[in-house]
Amino acid sequence: MKKIFGILLFFAFNFFCDAQNINFFTSKIEKTLTGGLTFRHLSDFSMENAAADICFSADMKELSFNSGFKLRSGIFDFTAQACYAPTIARHFNVGIMSIFHVNVYSDIFSEIDFLTGLYLKYDTLKHFKISSGIFYFYKEARIFSIADKIPRIYNHNLAKYIEFCFTPIQNLSLYMNLASYTYYRYTLYFSPDLKLGGEYRFSDWVSLGNEWDFQYIDMFTLSANYNGFENRFFVKLRF
């Protein structure tokens, strides 16, 4: 991941040297509303729970924002994400991304996560694109049973991700993501998460998709510990 991230940064810097090829803002905005249903399975493949989520996003290519929440039995998640990355030579985007996440387990604990750092994307504008990010990661947790003695627990950490997206035909997108976090799950570095997914666009305003999310605990500093997977079905509306 470090080598790929470095290569992307090197090429983006070369393009950045030509200021005429930089676009700082696109006025056209694409808004989407996505609703999903997720089934979580444990490492023995037994189903643990189901969850529903909804997310709104606004994308102007260089400037994007999205926010959503996820509900499970006794668990609530909220995430907001913003990114600004000027377009360089039509193919590269380099900028800053920030993420804010709140997770509450009813009567057990709550936590707040904040990530901010460098974001890179390369898009061929035809069939393939790759994006990557490296972030400072701040986590703050409050355990209700000991809150009178230890009000808060803090941690300063690191987060990374890389995603490949392939569009073999016009309306079909396939993607793979390897990261230390997901949109609603933020573990300390490095508990890898591998996501495989696809989305088919039936019309200009609606598409359906499916994702398989395989989760591990501490794959690299200890022996790999498979922690289960999530299977998510979603519908996306564009307007």
Residue ranges and their predicted role:
Residues 60-66, 89-96, 126-132, 167-176, ...:
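Repeated loop/turn-to-beta-strand initiation elements of outer-membrane beta-barrel proteins
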Residues 35-41, 67-71, 96-102, 118, ...:
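Transmembrane beta-barrel strands of outer-membrane/channel proteins
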Residues 111-183:
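Detector for outer-membrane/organellar transmembrane beta-barrel domains
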Residues 29-31, 46-52, 74-78, 102, ...:
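Residues that define the transmembrane beta-barrel architecture of outer-membrane proteins
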